[in-house]
Amino acid sequence: MTRHLIFAAVLLVCLFVCWNAVGAQDARSAFSSEETAQDQHVMEERIFINPAGNREKNACMENCRSSPNCKNYEFCSK
């Protein structure tokens, strides 16, 4: 009887550890995709911040106008 209880306890502990590992992996993967989206936004801004001339500034302003998230053009003038 005692062996059965020990076996059941060990089984429950293993199940709990595996369940938490799967949950932690899902959380890491969700954080990773959010981080990737932020990185893409930063890369887009770097393209706009580094204009080589008026043509690129105009393209930057045009891209900014077409984006619903863009509220001002101050990063285009740098």
Swiss-Prot record:
Q: Name one GO molecular function term.
A: toxin activity
**Secretion signal span:** 1-24
Any idea which UniProt keywords this protein has? Disulfide bond, Secreted, Signal, Toxin
Task: List the expressing tissues.
Answer: Expressed by the venom gland.
The record's Gene Ontology cellular component field reads:
extracellular region
Does the keyword field hold Secreted? yes
Task: Mark which residues the record calls propeptide.
Answer: 25-28
> Where is the protein found, in the record's own terms?
Secreted
After translation, the protein is modified as follows: Contains 2 disulfide bonds.
As for family, the record states: Belongs to the scoloptoxin-04 family.
Entry protein name: U-scoloptoxin(04)-Er1b
Organism the protein comes from? Ethmostigmus rubripes
